[in-house]
Amino acid sequence: MNLLLYILVSLQIVPTFYKNEQSFMKDLKVNPGFKLIKVYPNEDIEPPESTTIWIGYSQDALYVFARNYQKGIQASTRKRDSENIMADDWILVYVDTQGRGNEAYCFQFNPLGTKRDFILTEGGSNVEEWDGDWYVDVKNTEYGWDALLVIHFKSISFAKTDWGIQIERYIAKSTELQLLVKLPSFQQVKGIAALKLDFNKIFIESASYSLIPIVELRVEKEHSGEGEDNFYFRYGATARFKEGSGTLLDLTHRPDFSDVEVDIEQINLERLPVNYPEKRPFFIEGKDLISTPIELVRTRNIEYPVAGLKFYTRGKKLSFAGYFVKDSLLKYVGFSRATYSFEKNFILGIFNASAQGSFTLYSMDMNLYIPQVKMDIIGLWGKRMDAKSNIIYVKLKRRQEFKGLGFSLSYLSIDSSFISPIHLIYFDRVKKYSASLNYQFLLSKININVYGNYSTRKDKYTNELISEEYGPGISVSLAPFSFSLGSSRALLNYTGLPDARMDINFISFAYSLSSWKNISLSFNSGKYFGSDLKYIALRLNLSPFNKFNIGFQEDFIDCDIMPEKSVFQIFGEIPLTYAITFKPYLNYKKYKEGYDEVALNGIISYDISSTTGIYLGFTKNLSKNGKKWESNYEKIVFKIKAGYDLMNLIH
């Protein structure tokens, strides 16, 4: 029977057992493998740039080999676990090791060998970070590229039943998606191919344990204004206990995040603070387990942590994460969340947060996904116990992936006295209604998406209007080109300005080959709080010779009530050797009054392992009022971090 027909009809794969990886690779010459099916932008069971997959296993690992035919490979992301990989060429392998059809380990990689891993629940309603023991070996060939994925059984939890497997391949230049099994949703776990293994042949080692002490030593030189240089010697330490990939305990004292890259500045016309993402490792690992539908704790508000404890454990159904942090400003902050995953795409969460002497909160949240209609039903109820203030949030969302109708409807109610320093909620005593609608369709190879949104925020007790926003738009794409046109209308009474209206039209153009090979240009014009606004944004990302990545952003602003005239930024990832990377950043801001500011930042990192490395970072702020530049602040940090797994001494 033809293997492609076999998998489409029976949805079963019975892979061959091999002695080791080498014997699996030798068998590729005689085993025909499985072909992926093109499902977007049009369907084709034999696409010209085809993909052949081989699957096998040994006593300690699962093997997946992919042969990818392609002219003009596009990949530039080199940072592990970066979502930028989604704009590159990539392969994504789902493995449902419990056979329940509601959760899967995910292994994603691009032709550069950059890896991303996560745990996906049915329909993509929840994505959990996960760092497992797996590797991928990629190689460019005359016909495209090859990849070997090896997943060690000891790094995953599994049941001795039929597993599930889905394999996806994305080709960036044509936005082409290929699947092993055609399903209504590319994020669907239920209905993927059955993977039948003989568990009598699998040797399962005892759970792997790690006990890793990590010591950090750093020397800092700091200079502010016209004062003298100040030198500091600082230290920090972390003790980490890890059981497999599911349980982790971290104890940290005087953590340092000087090697964390800076934020790329964004301009927010709504006059609210930008919610920049968390980047500090202590708060990132396990963050997905404490995430709620409305962000009740923003970890970036914990700016100066002195010590911290973190614990999380992931079970088949029950998971828990807890953080307890001592901060220089907020004193003691603690937050935790437990989640229970039911069989039928239903997740229930219980959350708690407290800050010393000022804040105590309990909440419950739920997410129900209905795959037949691609619908999420999301809800949250919480109560600030010290202020007896409630929050209620309900959202109904229908997902639209490639074509068809998508929409969301939501309602948010917050009582008075709910605002706290540890979250990012700017308004209390409010009720907010939001709605969005979009419809996507294809004309030949042209993708067209028409959309609109509306939201209104009112005082919960007086019904006074606080803000109202709406805007239609349309986007058209023919890979690698795209074009969008739309408008944004808003009445933002919370600004307190005499004329609080914002009426802006925009048009944008983009050309994108991969995450670091793209350019976009947008034009915005209209009325902005009673003044004329003209705003041009240019974005350019380059990957010269596929050796390093460099990005440029330029924002030109012409508006009487905005102080900035232009903001120019440079950032990048520049490998100096195999393990040494330089990450530069420059922000040059010009003001209308003739005042200029420059912020320089750079990190040179030598990463020996995830727990050991050497780092050199610098920061320098300059200003010019007239013709002379003055240094306002500068800092240089040299840091050594060393960690070792003590369990290696036992083995």
For the regions a language model picked out, list residue spans one by one:
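Sec-dependent N-terminal signal peptides
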Residues: 2-10
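Short, solvent-exposed loop/turn segments at the edges of secondary structure
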Residues: 86-88, 102, 359-361, 389-391
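Outer-membrane beta-barrel transmembrane domain signature of Gram-negative proteins
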Residues: 187-206, 328-362, 485-541
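Surface-exposed extracellular loop regions of Gram-negative outer-membrane beta-barrel proteins
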Residues: 204-250, 333-383, 443-451, 510-512, ...
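Exposed, low-structure sequence patches enriched in small/polar residues
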Residues: 304-306, 312, 372-651
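Structural preference for beta-rich elements and adjacent junctions enriched in aromatics
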Residues: 10-335, 339-340, 349, 631
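Short secondary-structure boundary/capping segments
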Residues: 266-270, 364, 393-394, 424-426
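A generic structural motif
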Residues: 59, 88, 244-246, 343, ...
